[in-house]
Amino acid sequence: MKPELLETFENQYPNRDYTIEIVNPEFTSVCPKTGLPDFGTITLQYIPNKLCVELKSLKYYYLEFRNAGIFYENVTNKILDDLVKAVKPKEMKIISEWKARGGITTTVTASYEAEK
């Protein structure tokens, strides 16, 4: 995973709190136990401060996970950490919803809130 792929642009309305929601319904990674592919939906919700994430760079960042052996919980927290570092939002939440494996589905949510 390469967080340096993430690009940003200036938020034109930094004094207004508004929520940006970006959904990737085609996220893939690899189960580190079985080596089988994991399929999920990643939802990014954030209130920007001075910067917003650029979508094409986010897409390529997500593609870095395609061949990575990584647990769901680690995917979710890694994405949150990398995006918080790049965007420095007021608030951010990552929700990862994973397709059923052995009849069990998993949803992982990780959140960040800047100190006021």
Curated annotation (Swiss-Prot):
SUPFAM superfamilies: Tetrahydrobiopterin biosynthesis enzymes-like. It is found in: Cytoplasm. GO terms for molecular function: preQ1 synthase activity. Its EC number is 1.7.1.13. Keywords: Cytoplasm, NADP, Oxidoreductase, Queuosine biosynthesis. Pathway: tRNA modification; tRNA-queuosine biosynthesis. Substrate binds at residues 53-55, 72-73. Catalyzes the NADPH-dependent reduction of 7-cyano-7-deazaguanine (preQ0) to 7-aminomethyl-7-deazaguanine (preQ1). Belongs to the GTP cyclohydrolase I family. QueF type 1 subfamily. This is NADPH-dependent 7-cyano-7-deazaguanine reductase. It comes from Chloroherpeton thalassium (strain ATCC 35110 / GB-78). The lineage of its organism: Bacteria, Pseudomonadati, Chlorobiota, Chlorobiia, Chlorobiales.
